[in-house]
Amino acid sequence: MSNKILTLKNVSKHYRQGNSIIRVLDDLNLNINEGELIAIIGSSGSGKSTLLHIAGLLDKPTNGEVIIANNEYKTNHLIRLNYLGFIYQQHHLLKDFTAIENVIMPRLINGSNQKEAIEAAKSILDSLGLGKKLHNMPGELSGGEQQRVAIARSLINKPKIILADEPTGNLDPKTTNEVFNLFLKVAKEQNTAIVMVTHNHELAHRMDKLYKLKHGALNMS
């Protein structure tokens, strides 16, 4: 039996521009089950990032509900820490902190002691092939290594779902495949669902479900 972990129910997002209303998302519905891999494609400006921000409680819908773990939430910092992880095209690592220091931060914020957080970070960085780069600064890492650190940081609290916005968009094709393979491997080991926005159709077709966002609506592709 599937275990639904995130639902967008009749979600709309509208912006007013002068006397006009721009309908970015229009009565959109999406159900995400535990461990499910979902890709969303669409043209630039179609609302893909807006959709992720609403799903991740970083933005509010004009209408509709965001339901996480069977509860409706408008915005909640603790829910984001416990249930959601985020990965972006830019790694957003703190340049003055080492790889492992960047990774342990969400764990410490979530209440873990430093020893436990370090052990968890070592384990996940090692699984991503960075066991020998724990104490490197971001500037000492390649682009692919930086993004793997960002992936480790997003997974450190074992979230139920990862929201990924073009997670390999800045990487060359070879590095893209290497990073994406490791990302899927660790997510599957943790039974973490992924919702990924991407322009890379090859990666999109490797997911369980593929949706296209067009005219504010999601359609199975």
Swiss-Prot record:
- According to the entry, every stretch annotated as the ABC transporter domain falls at 6-220
The record's annotation in SUPFAM superfamilies points to: P-loop containing nucleoside triphosphate hydrolases
Q: What is its main location?
A: membrane
Function, as annotated, reads: Part of the ABC transporter complex LolCDE involved in the translocation of mature outer membrane-directed lipoproteins, from the inner membrane to the periplasmic chaperone, LolA. Responsible for the formation of the LolA-lipoprotein complex in an ATP-dependent manner.
The subunit structure is: The complex is composed of two ATP-binding proteins (LolD) and two transmembrane proteins (LolC and LolE).
Q: Which GO terms describe its cellular component?
A: plasma membrane
Q: Identify the keywords attached in UniProt to this record, alphabetized.
A: ATP-binding, Cell inner membrane, Cell membrane, Membrane, Nucleotide-binding, Translocase, Transport
Q: Give its E.C. classification number.
A: 7.6.2.-
**Which ranges does the record mark as transmembrane?**
none
Q: Does the keyword Cell wall biogenesis/degradation apply?
A: no
Q: Which domain of life is it from?
A: Bacteria
One GO biological process this protein is involved in is: lipoprotein localization to outer membrane
Compartments where found:
Cell inner membrane
Task: Say which family it is in.
Answer: Belongs to the ABC transporter superfamily. Lipoprotein translocase (TC 3.A.1.125) family.
The gene name reads: lolD
Q: Which Pfam families match?
A: ABC_tran
* Membrane topology of this protein: Peripheral membrane protein
Q: Which organism is it from?
A: Rickettsia bellii (strain RML369-C)
Record InterPro entries: AAA+_ATPase (IPR003593), ABC_transporter-like_ATP-bd (IPR003439), ABC_transporter-like_CS (IPR017871), ABC_transpr_LolD-like (IPR015854), MacB-like_ATP-bd (IPR017911), P-loop_NTPase (IPR027417)
Q: What is the protein name stated in its UniProt record?
A: Lipoprotein-releasing system ATP-binding protein LolD
Annotated residues that bind ATP are located at: 42-49
Q: Name one GO molecular function term.
A: ATP binding
